[in-house]
Amino acid sequence: MQGQKIRIRLKAFDYRLIDQSTQEIVDTAKRTGAQVRGPIPLPTKKERFTVLISPHVNKDARDQYEIRTHKRLLDIVEPTEKTVDALMKLDLAAGVDVQISLG
């Protein structure tokens, strides 16, 4: 796997879960001898929703909700076979979305 790099993008609603998962990936990659660049925090996406709480009139009565999507980016440079095997066996938290690309 000389000259390749693995790019890992993580997404989660809870920043504690994403930071914990990122730390597990970094520790695993460093333990197997790969060089890690990151974690790079990407901009947080904020989605806001406004809901009328009155069943009939009173347009002034509203509730506002927000969902924040936290993102992190990791690059693993010059991964070894041991690195790939260790990352495949890694068990991350259920609330974290992981996208892996080879480049």
UniProtKB/Swiss-Prot annotation:
The keyword Transport does not apply. Pfam families: Ribosomal_S10. PROSITE patterns: RIBOSOMAL_S10 (PS00361). It comes from the Bacteria. The keyword Ribosomal protein applies. GO terms for molecular function: structural constituent of ribosome; tRNA binding. GO terms for biological process: translation. One of its GO terms (cellular component) is ribosome. Keywords: Ribonucleoprotein, Ribosomal protein. Belongs to the universal ribosomal protein uS10 family. Part of the 30S ribosomal subunit. Involved in the binding of tRNA to the ribosomes. This is Small ribosomal subunit protein uS10. It comes from Hahella chejuensis (strain KCTC 2396). The lineage of its organism: Bacteria, Pseudomonadati, Pseudomonadota, Gammaproteobacteria, Oceanospirillales.
